[in-house]
Amino acid sequence: KDLDRNTRSKSALENNPNLPIFIMDNFETTIQKVYDMDPNRIESITILKDAAATALYGSRAANGVVVITTVAPKSGEVRVTYNMVGTISMPNLNDYNLMNARQKLEAEVASGMYEAEGEDFWFKKIRIEEYQGKLKNVREGVNTYWLAKPLRTEFNHKHSLYLEGGNEEFRYGIDLGYNNENGVMKGSYRDRIDAGFSIYYTTSKVQVSNYISYGVTKEKESPYGEFSQYTKMLPYERYKDDDGKMLRILQWSRVLDFEPYNPLYEADLGNYDKGQTNVLVENLSVNWFIKPTFWVKGELGISHSTGKREAFIDPLSVKNNLEYGDDRTNVGSLTLTNTEYTSWEGKLAISYNESINNHNINVGGGLEVKTTRRRTNTGTYKGFQSAEFSSPEFARSMPYKPNFQEVQTRLFGIFARLNYSYQDIYLLDASLRIDGSSEFGSDKRYAPFFSGGLGLNIHKYAFMEKYDFVNHLKVRGSFGQTGKVNFAPYAAVPTHEIDIDEWYISGPASSL
């Protein structure tokens, strides 16, 4: 699960642009798909990090490439494989060596927190009353260990079922999976159900493989908020009143700048942040063997996903950030976000491999096209009377304009490669790829990526035969160029923003 850290260091930037690309069975996939898949379905994983190895992937490979090959269905009788993995997730707070309530108050006294010089009578009086209030809580046995309040220990389970069969000419495989993952933060979870169907058709001249999958992921954030909030809490702070009800406001612990609210009170309200994602993937690959040494390969990949997210703030929540005299008819809010993502990927490649005497030549080339489109719309509704009625139809108003966004990218690339060896001792590798992308600036629409390498298999020399304890000794060197687009798709394209709040005789205002 640490591929994103081990291949290249993580970035603190949003969406982690330092992630490598993941290629599964020759098609690009997401890191989430890799995390969710059954490890028993993986035949091999190859991590490409140096420029010479990644140059053929062009403008996407600057952070490395993770190539994954899955296990193909086996011919013969129908086989059913079931796998279940259970894990226990528990928080580890051993690294937090915190003071208890009495120690914290004694440390404040020792630091002179309540003995500031030069203050007038009223400031001194406030400090004394604050100290007396904290001391009263300590003497009454208040010693709240806030770090443990939002946490829990969970048993998670992951199930996978695989059915395979067929004959030498036609094989098929059906995979089903369910992943239940509850977080250590109370109320958080991520559940995923997916299914896939693969077929392999093979003759002496043609090889066809197709894989289609569909997955549904449901997730929910913890109503207890961020764990970092609880690290700021003070142990002598009460979180319940004498009747056992949650306190809305705390006395001394400040979580937000505007008000020291109680996060445990917020957890008892109707706040929620949840979402669902549906993903459909279709991958088709066709190999045509014109000759044993010459073949053509075509690939087509289609991915379509839809997502919906709902974030609701209870009208009783402190997060409404109301001040005295504010209009309370607009308390409570619901933010709905809908996303739609479509990706088309096509590739056509030819390859020729020939051995002539002591010479072995492998050459190939091809082209690749890819287009993606993402649509997002977001709307916020305000003015709810109760958390029990959080549907948009119960909202009082929609104070902000809905936000609609569409982002589309296109990529076209051509590539060529050469692998040559003489007597399997002297090795030569070279590759070239030229990418054209809508994300590049208009002054330079195309970018070249090349690599070259030399190698020497010393263990293949005749004089090495007497050193039977050496079975592999190789010297190699390589050079390559990589690159990556790290800015927004339209950052290199002049765009106009229309301001419908400013109207002139000629129409609405716009800015470049």
Give residue ranges: language-model regions.
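Residues embedded in well-ordered regular secondary structure
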Residues: 1, 13-16, 20, 64, ...
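Extracellular/periplasmic, surface-exposed regions of secreted and cell-surface proteins
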Residues: 157, 192, 198-216, 257-313, ...
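Transmembrane beta-barrel wall of Gram-negative outer-membrane proteins
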Residues: 147-222, 229-241, 277-283
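A surface-exposed, glycine/aromatic-enriched loop/edge motif typical of exported proteins
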Residues: 95-128, 215-256, 311-313, 373-380, ...
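Flexible glycine-/small-residue-rich
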Residues: 7-11, 26, 49, 70-72, ...
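Short, glycine-/polar-rich solvent-exposed loops and beta-turns at beta-strand/coil boundaries
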Residues: 1-3, 35-40, 57-62, 188-190, ...
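Extracytoplasmic beta-strand/coil segments of soluble accessory domains associated
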Residues: 1-25, 44, 54-74
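Short acidic/polar hinge/loop motifs at secondary-structure boundaries
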Residues: 20, 25-51
